[in-house]
Swiss-Prot record:
Record-level Gene Ontology MF annotations: transmembrane transporter activity
Pfam families tied to this protein: MFS_1, Sugar_tr
Cellular-component GO terms for this entry: plasma membrane
Species whose genome carries this gene: Salmonella choleraesuis (strain SC-B67)
Protein name (database record): Multidrug resistance protein MdtG
Location relative to the cell: Cell inner membrane
Amino acid sequence: MSPSDVPINWKRNLTVTWLGCFLTGAAFSLVMPFLPLYVEQLGVTGHSALNMWSGLVFSITFLFSAIASPFWGGLADRKGRKIMLLRSALGMAIVMLLMGMAQNIWQFLILRALLGLLGGFILNANALIATQVPRHKSGWALGTLSTGGVSGALLGPLAGGLLADHYGLRPVFFITASVLFICFLLTFFFIRENFLPVSKKEMLHVREVVASLKNPRLVLSLFVTTLIIQVATGSIAPILTLYVRELAGNVSNIAFISGMIASVPGVAALLSAPRLGKLGDRIGPEKILIVALIISVLLLIPMSFVQTPWQLALLRFLLGAADGALLPAVQTLLVYNSTNQIAGRIFSYNQSFRDIGNVTGPLMGAAISASYGFRAVFCVTAGVVLFNAIYSWNSLRRRRLAIE
């Protein structure tokens, strides 16, 4: 029996990759609450300079991740996904360790760029599970896996803030590096993959990858959907605290209220993603995708008219429940429309679009709020998501007509 014929316990791999995604999500978000403070500690002074450098060190990670993802995706298709998980976890652990030793802002900026170049654990975890899980359980498995990163991202800022208050800023980077090294060890000892390496000559070129897709236009529309999902999420991030302050008036605990309202969509997504993923396996992920996009539009519009923070919190909770279905549905449709041979690259291209959305979303939100006010951001974002819903519906309708 060849290595590729040995059965894989995909449920164990799903459990271990979930833990890995949880630890990675937590590790990334551990340092997020105090990034501007660390930038200031590295010698940046002045309001405008601090804003500029904080924005740079935040966005450069996503920018370099967008550039590097296709390369790592191609390497994953050649060498296997487990080795990419190991490479990512260990590489990020080393970079985080070095961040805690940075002496000036330029060193820190370069290390943030390296973090983007060496990242990709969650991307490769999705590709690994997508190629191992039975197709009829893809929605449930990918939905469940997505809750790992979401859970970590929810707990990370809270833990990071507490650790920074007790131990200072630099030690948090060392703790984060330790968390990522634990992720490396879990992957090394417990994840199993039967993968026969492919030589560079045997690898499909980009044109051949596109030609091998069942529906290239649909796959492109799914990439665009991923980008717009992240644009919609990111556009609200820069103005959320300020909008909450406008709604709440003079209250002493504005930071707590803002933090709670920022986190409720993640909690809702955590609850909804596996259930909606399983429903998608029954009725089709395309139906889940379109309905979730339409619900998102219907929830974004009233956010521009709310009068209290609690009204905003309720709408954001419902929005999070709908959003919890979006990326797993996109990933499931990508699985349906590609082969295992090119899964790494398809997921990496999707990650690049996601990273571009992470960069452009906050820029769009900040620009709109500066010109037209906070409330306009929600209306414009709703319009962008509505366009995406129509575009996605049209792409899926064409696929259905082509099949018929």
